Amino acid sequence: MLSLKTLLCTLLTVSSVLATPVPARDPSSIQFVHEENKKRYYDYDHGSLGEPIRGVNIGGWLLLEPYITPSLFEAFRTNDDNDEGIPVDEYHFCQYLGKDLAKSRLQSHWSTFYQEQDFANIASQGFNLVRIPIGYWAFQTLDDDPYVSGLQESYLDQAIGWARNNSLKVWVDLHGAAGSQNGFDNSGLRDSYKFLEDSNLAVTTNVLNYILKKYSAEEYLDTVIGIELINEPLGPVLDMDKMKNDYLAPAYEYLRNNIKSDQVIIIHDAFQPYNYWDDFMTENDGYWGVTIDHHHYQVFASDQLERSIDEHIKVACEWGTGVLNESHWTVCGEFAAALTDCTKWLNSVGFGARYDGSWVNGDQTSSYIGSCANNDDIAYWSDERKENTRRYVEAQLDAFEMRGGWIIWCYKTESSLEWDAQRLMFNGLFPQPLTDRKYPNQCGTISN
């Protein structure tokens, strides 16, 4: 747990002097070596792992998402006609239960949903990295927060140990900011966009600095090869200049100047277009070890859902070519096999699905595209749907391996098929081994 006093001290000590730029790469080396501390850090474009990042997200574990673990939220159901009374996110989950009961249910979830055998399976299936989301409240809360706090960190540390034991690398992902950075349920608090309010920004900065300091220490650098400063900030509704100047840049300076670490930082693209970040934290200005994280889905708008499979694949391939000339390293930190939004609560509790026309959000509605019946039962999938899903997955893998690689969302769920890498592999919809291709060169390239 962190204190607000620590925050003030930390913020006051952040230096404004940039770290020594990393030397030019030795043509014979796949890694940079920083002059000051001689430590190596991972070059996501040039093979420091010996292959592209091929990872999985550990979603729905240390930060709840209703569609990943619906049983935790179904426990609140009072009728079969609608979702009234069901909490929409972890904030309301804890608020409805009270901290003691919420703590009991969450500890049961944390101790069972992922165990070391899962990480052994991940490694045996050929993946090389796990991205682990966690919310700010795991480390510090606002005065009126209902969240359970102070316990998740030990599970995160345990997971890093599991990863190390199985030769997996880790991204630690700050997935939820105080006040919420995007209003999504996956931030912990739906329908709020108050991340950059001064009090919320101060708490989130304090938490981030704690994460940076701890997981950039020598004991973690063999396994933790990136820290994501904040997941999916909703750029179109945020003050981007304030986020850059008051959150992202100070985090970099704290990491390089105070901690003296060569840890890689991950910046989500904030839903901005390709090349938007090219002039931010540039090598010419002395910055290094910066990776841009792009997330790609084609299911959260009706026009996307209406695309033919060939159109889906064309868009996926453009995701790869679109980042070829971005100046920073780039990785696709989230994508999915999904071609529908049928999974219950994918669009959040109470909203329905656009695909079958049941989606309602205020006065916004959707029109029927196709049926969602038996969506999570592979026995009801046609051969064409199976082939299309496999084609789409392979196209995305090829596209994302044009640069630094990919991290699928997510490794497992309680019941979803389209969003569960385990089920996808079991049913032949996701390649095993990961380099296997039934539909090679869909993007006009050969995968690594």
From Swiss-Prot:
It is an enzyme of class 3 (hydrolase). Its main location: secreted. GO terms for biological process: fungal-type cell wall organization; glucan catabolic process; glucan metabolic process. One of its GO terms (cellular component) is extracellular region. The active site is at residues 232, 334. GO terms for molecular function: glucan exo-1,3-beta-glucosidase activity. It is found in: Secreted, Cell wall; Secreted. Disulfide bonds: none annotated. Glycans are attached at residues 165, 325. Its EC number is 3.2.1.58. It holds the Pfam family Cellulase. Present with 4280 molecules/cell in log phase SD medium. Belongs to the glycosyl hydrolase 5 (cellulase A) family. This is Glucan 1,3-beta-glucosidase I/II. It comes from Saccharomyces cerevisiae (strain ATCC 204508 / S288c) (Baker's yeast). The gene is EXG1.
